[in-house]
């Protein structure tokens, strides 16, 4: 087993490594988005290398990370992460609306996403939602809740990943299939350039299903209260 304790660089983001590996052969370590969130795992590369990943706990692998490089053979072990597709909702149109309309639409959109237990991140005037159901169902939810005026599209997760910070990527792609979640509006002070809408897991139904609720209740989480639509 080859022990990997450090990431050398990233061939997709680092110009230095892009130049170094422009003629290299890539031996890929293929991970799904859940595996990529683990700082420790053991897996074979596509060429059969037995790799033991043992990174610091706060470090997670990203698509394009270089784990090893043999200059003599010009072979590099590079991470390939298979990400879910993402629904991208464009909020730019709201800039022309009145403050009251803007607040109302954002609140209703956050409620609609949270009521479906969908993870989401807002950034660059867009909302990113990883697919956990068929695109036709997500399309139907958007139209049923009256968001036809908000342009939305479906793109590959790899297209969105470079736009995200590490914490946003973990939030969006880390276990996106876990659907027991609710919407949380974060303080701008949490991350200077981060997102304003986060979704965090809150409870397990135990049966692996999602559903909508139709009655209201409020409860406390220690130092703050908030309402949920149930």
Swiss-Prot record:
<feature type="region of interest" description="Disordered">
    <location>
        <begin position="200"/>
        <end position="230"/>
    </location>
</feature>
<comment type="function">
    <text>Involved in urease metallocenter assembly. Binds nickel. Probably functions as a nickel donor during metallocenter assembly.</text>
</comment>
<dbReference type="GO" id="GO:0016151">
    <property type="term" value="F:nickel cation binding"/>
</dbReference>
<feature type="compositionally biased region" description="Basic residues">
    <location>
        <begin position="200"/>
        <end position="210"/>
    </location>
</feature>
<dbReference type="GO" id="GO:0006457">
    <property type="term" value="P:protein folding"/>
</dbReference>
<comment type="similarity">
    <text>Belongs to the UreE family.</text>
</comment>
<dbReference type="InterPro" id="IPR004029">
    <property type="entry name" value="UreE_N"/>
</dbReference>
<dbReference type="GO" id="GO:0051082">
    <property type="term" value="F:unfolded protein binding"/>
</dbReference>
<dbReference type="InterPro" id="IPR036118">
    <property type="entry name" value="UreE_N_sf"/>
</dbReference>
<dbReference type="Pfam" id="PF02814">
    <property type="entry name" value="UreE_N"/>
</dbReference>
<dbReference type="InterPro" id="IPR012406">
    <property type="entry name" value="UreE"/>
</dbReference>
<keyword id="KW-0996">Nickel insertion</keyword>
<keyword id="KW-0963">Cytoplasm</keyword>
<keyword id="KW-0143">Chaperone</keyword>
<dbReference type="GO" id="GO:0005737">
    <property type="term" value="C:cytoplasm"/>
</dbReference>
<feature type="compositionally biased region" description="Basic and acidic residues">
    <location>
        <begin position="211"/>
        <end position="230"/>
    </location>
</feature>
<protein>
    <recommendedName>
        <fullName>Urease accessory protein UreE</fullName>
    </recommendedName>
</protein>
<keyword id="KW-0533">Nickel</keyword>
<comment type="function">
    <text>Expression of the urease operon increases the likelihood of bacterial survival by contributing to acid resistance in vitro and in vivo in BALB/c mice. Y.enterocolitica enters the body via an oral path and must survive the acidic stomach before being able to colonize the intestinal mucosa.</text>
</comment>
<keyword id="KW-0843">Virulence</keyword>
